Amino acid sequence: RIPWKELQRHFASGYTLVVDLQLDLIEAGYQFQQDNSSQIELWLNANLIQQVSIEQARQWFNDDASLWACVVAPWVLIQHPD
């Protein structure tokens, strides 16, 4: 887990993606690492992986949220443990 405040510079660069809790974060990271574009496209089209919105980033900042993260350069995949 990592505090959102430590991920803000990645967000500012446009490289943070939020992974829906229906998906396993490590499996999603593996598919990115394998460059499995067909699987990633399916997840993107189903909104299971999305860019972190400004509203979500602001909420995580205000809540001092701690998130699960998986780095697959240049991407940082994030899940918020509910």
What are these regions (language model features)?
Residues 50-82:
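Short, compact, well-ordered microdomains
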Residues 21-23, 44-48, 74-76:
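Generic secondary-structure microfeatures
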